[in-house]
Amino acid sequence: MCLDFHPKFPALLAVGCYDGTVMVFDIRIKGNNKPIYQSTVRTAKHTDPVWQVRWSSDDATKNMSFYSISSDGRVTTWNLMKNKLEPEEVIKLKLVAEQDKELSDNKKDAFVYGLAGGMCFDFNKFHDQLFLVGTEEGKIHLCSRAYSG
C-alpha cells in the first residue's frame, strides 16, 4: 500500500500493508525478502489498511522510529528496538458529526460516531510537534505529538 525510505539510512524501507501490518526491510540483504521488523496482532498492528508511513527524526533515546496512519482511525509511531517493533499510539481520530436541527437548538452539540479513517499526514517543517492529518471524510486536522490520545 505505501512505503518510505529512511532519510539517513536509505537501505531501510518502512512499508504499510492493506491488512494493517507495518514492516521494515533492509534492502542490503540480498536474496532475503523477509522484513527485519514486522507488526503483529500481539504488537497492536492496525486493523484496517495502512495508507501512509513516514520515518521521523530519531528520538532522544536514539531509537529509529516511523509513523503510520490507517483507516482504523489511529496514528501510531513504531520504535525500532533491538529485537522488536514497539508501537505507541499517537492519536485516535474521532469521527464527529453535527446533530440534526430537530434534535437540538444548540448547533454546537455533536455526536461522536466512532473513529475517522485516516488517509494521510505530514509534519510541520518549522514546529516538529505539529502535523496535519487528512481523513476519508475529507477533513484536515491539526494535531500535536505533544498530546496523545
Describe the predicted segments one by one:
Residues C2, H6, A14, Y18-G20, ...:
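Catalytic cores of eukaryotic secretory-pathway lumenal/extracellular enzymes that build
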Residues M1-C2, I29-S56, T77-C120, H141-G149:
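Inter-blade linker and blade-boundary elements of WD-repeat/beta-propeller domains
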Residues D19-M23, D72-V75, E137-H141:
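Short coil/turn segments within WD40 beta-propeller repeats
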Residues L3-P10, V53-N63, Y113, D122-D128:
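Loop/turn segments within WD40 beta-propeller blades
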Residues F9-A14, A60-Y67, T76, H127-V133, ...:
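Structural hallmark of WD40 beta-propellers
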Residues P10, V15, D19, H46-V50, ...:
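Generic preference for well-ordered alpha-helical elements
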Residues P10-A14, Q38-K45, W55, D72, ...:
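Contiguous hydrophobic segments
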